[in-house]
Amino acid sequence: MINYRHIVFCLCVMVVVDSRLTPYLAAIEQVDPIVKIVLPIVGRFDPEEFVTSWQGNNPCEWFGTNCLEGIIIGISFISLNLIGTISPHFADLTSLRVIDLSHNRLKCTIPFEITKLKNLTIVDVSYNQLHGEVPRVRGIVILTERNPNIESTCLLVPSPTRNKNKPTVLVLLLGILVGLVVAGGASFGFYLYRIRKQPKRLQEPNEAVTLTQQQSSDESLVSDESYVISLQLQYRVLRRFSWVSKGPLLLTRQLKTNQNPHLPYM
């Protein structure tokens, strides 16, 4: 037999519980999406500093937030004695322009995720205890004064992005070094080639002088032979006509030129 009393009791309990949970469920559903983004950021710090002051559903009314037309454009947590690390969830606030976390006790690295913020201009993390590399992004000024261990290795939050870029940089430097070595070797080889070619060039004028001397000597021989032939020819001609003149035969030396043709044989 069905116990109706038990069923009625269960239904009454469910109604009471539902009526009590409804406001809480509604509050959770009505939470501003920005609140859901900001809370994980604060969770990396000491939350006790924010529990008493951060109330309500409008983050623009909370201390440390700067808004423009209902949009958070700045986070300023200066001298709050915050401990912990800087949350990468800052990158979820896409409208951020300024992040000021100076004069605290924050440790470890500056997350590289903040470099994705297109509107970000200033990040002030001076006077903290940060370690690791500082992101280098054009258009973003990162102030790191009085962080004695900045740029050193932090084992808690490694940076896989930078580690992947290191082999590329090494390959680039190696390629430049090899190119310089090859260029230097080629220049040195060309220099040696020029040195070896110079003695040969210096000997060329001597050879030219030798050839000139040989040519001049050959010409002198030809001229002497012509002179001998010319004398013989004159002698023979005068001998043919010796009956005209009773005096001794006279020979004259004639230079061989184009204007003095040989006398015909008679």
Swiss-Prot record:
The keyword Transport does not apply. The chain crosses the membrane at residues 170-190. Glycans are attached at N119. Residues 20-169 are extracellular. Pfam families: LRR_8. Keywords: Cell membrane, Glycoprotein, Leucine-rich repeat, Membrane, Receptor, Repeat, Signal, Transmembrane, Transmembrane helix. This is Receptor-like protein 5. It comes from Arabidopsis thaliana. The lineage of its organism: Eukaryota, Viridiplantae, Streptophyta, Embryophyta, Tracheophyta.
